[in-house]
């Protein structure tokens, strides 16, 4: 049911696709069991149809996760689903190191990512030398990343890479990425192994946008990432603390878009929250129901920020939640108006 290195992300997408069907069935007074049956029927028709399409493949896993999505939507309701989804998403961002031995790497040539064109002059981990081979500390090496920790390096900057290029990284003996400090275009990029990665979801990275913007190839600069009460990234005199993944970026657990610009990703952040909160407004009954649903959804967002590694959303993400709630309610009213509109036909006598 879960296959491949990002099998859970694919399963999550299939589940999410049918959650609105569960909302719809539940709004007609049916329970989760009925939603499950409807989900099975609809997904079964789709999978059966794909048997006759060239290049398409029907799968049992799609049937299971689609129908599960309908069940979850009916069981939790729109507001409950948003709250649970954000809490689960935040929990998946917990750092999750392995117990295997760790290897340090200076601008490694990994094949899956371009090699950084600059040069690493020196590097340290927790003020101790950080070599480009097996870390000399006594195992388990995961203790090296217990807070507080700092990975830092002095480098000769290279040209801006078109995709994420590691400058300093830590991999374990099983070739699993534990930590990466690198560059992408003019951004300083940091990412680490999280519970999401361990469970085969995608995992968003964290950046200093334009960190290399005023740095030319050949300049000597220092870069670092440190963890304690909050995550801090630094490039020369530019430091950002409290950085991390916001609720709006939680879509990256299912399908993270690394290549596009940050402005594009922020647009996706906005639309993702609008899409999450819109069903709350659409399926709420009256102002009281709308207020309760909004409270549950926004409460779930606040709880995720308080008790998980998610960081506080910006104003744009708060506006996106409110827009979703309002747009959902407006769409419901439009549907009601269309349904009640006279057809113009008169009854014959």
Describe every region a protein language model picked out.
Residues 1-61, 67-349:
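Bulky hydrophobic segments
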């Amino acid at each position: 049911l879960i296959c491949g290195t990002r099998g859970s992300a694919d399963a999550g997408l299939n589940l999410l696709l049918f959650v609105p069907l569960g909302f719809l069935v539940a709004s007609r007074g049916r329970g989760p069991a009925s939603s499950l049956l409807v989900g099975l029927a609809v997904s079964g028709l789709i999978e059966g149809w794909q048997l006759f399409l060239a290049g398409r493949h029907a799968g049992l896993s799609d049937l299971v996760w689609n129908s599960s999505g309908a069940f979850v939507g009916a069981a939790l309701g729109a507001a409950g689903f948003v709250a649970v989804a954000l809490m689960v998403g935040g929990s998946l961002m917990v750092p999750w190191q392995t117990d295997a031995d760790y290897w340090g790497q200076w601008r490694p040539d990994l094949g899956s990512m371009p090699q950084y064109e600059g040069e690493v002059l020196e590097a340290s981990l927790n003020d101790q030398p950080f070599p480009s081979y097996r870390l000399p500390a006594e195992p388990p090496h995961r203790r090296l990343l217990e807070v507080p920790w700092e990975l830092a390096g002095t480098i000769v900057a290279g040209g801006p890479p078109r995709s994420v290029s590691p400058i300093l990284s830590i991999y374990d003996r099983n070739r699993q990425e534990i930590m990466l400090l690198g560059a992408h275009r003019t951004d300083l990029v940091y990412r680490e192994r999280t519970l999401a990665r361990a469970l085969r979801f995608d995992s968003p990275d964290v950046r200093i946008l334009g960190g290399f913007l005023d740095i030319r190839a050949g300049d000597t600069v220092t870069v670092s990432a440190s963890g304690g009460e909050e995550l801090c990234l630094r490039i020369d005199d530019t430091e950002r603390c409290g950085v991390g993944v916001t609720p709006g970026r939680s879509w990256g657990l299912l399908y993270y878009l690394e290549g596009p610009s940050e402005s594009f990703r922020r647009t996706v952040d906005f639309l993702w929250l609008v899409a999450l909160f819109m069903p709350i407004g659409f399926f709420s009954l009256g102002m009281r129901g709308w207020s309760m649903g909004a409270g549950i959804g926004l409460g779930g967002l606040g709880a995720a920020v308080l008790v998980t590694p998610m960081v506080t959303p910006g104003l744009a993400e708060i506006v996106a939640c409110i827009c979703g709630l309002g747009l959902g309610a407006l769409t419901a009213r439009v549907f009601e108006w269309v349904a009640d509109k006279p057809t113009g036909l008169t009854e014959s006598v």
